Amino acid sequence: GVLLGYYADNVKLIPLAMKILRDNVGCPLEFASELLRLERIHRESGLPSSITALVISDSPARRDIFAEAIRQRRQLDISWDIRLSDRDILITIMPLHGDAAVTGYLLRTQRWLQEMFNATKFMDAKVTPYTALVNERPAEELLTNLLERCLVRQA
């Protein structure tokens, strides 16, 4: 029952996910599908989910910070790593977690930035965090807005 429902859900989401993939080169299918699934879950049950983005600007520690951010991922999170010439971006979907989980994630990130890179604030490490809640807004629009805020897409 559960596996069949999950499979049927995936089949329904594929066309919508393909549109997200066409509009966002490099976006993993798993990321797009999970975002759409969580949008539906929120619409049907009101359960929150969140997305965070860490934009790591060019600095001598940029590659090390990005690598550590990837290592710090939680097991259930789904991520999209974007590598650009002047910055790296780690976008993380936090399924079924709202504001409190985002706050905890950002505090943990700030703590390891301080411990490992001696950066007391995000801006000391040239890291800019962005967050978004999965809500009534269509998943594609939510992602587009987040990418615009991260300066990946033009508004």
Which residues fall in each region the model found?
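Conserved helix-loop-beta segment at the catalytic/binding core of cyclic-nucleotide signaling proteins
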Residues: 59-60, 66-101, 110-123
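Flexible, glycine/charge-rich interdomain/linker segments that couple
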Residues: 14-26, 126-133, 152-155
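A short glycine-enriched loop-to-beta-strand structural element that forms part of the catalytic core
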Residues: 50, 80-96, 118-150
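Long, highly charged amphipathic alpha-helices
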Residues: 2, 6, 37, 65-68, ...
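Active-site-proximal structural segments of metal-dependent nucleotidyl cyclase/transferase enzymes
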Residues: 34-57
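Signal-transmission/dimerization alpha-helices at domain junctions
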Residues: 1-18
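Interdomain coupling helix/linker and adjacent catalytic-core signature
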Residues: 22-41, 61-66, 101, 105
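Catalytic cores and conserved motifs of cyclic dinucleotide signaling enzymes
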Residues: 47, 61-68, 100-104, 133-155
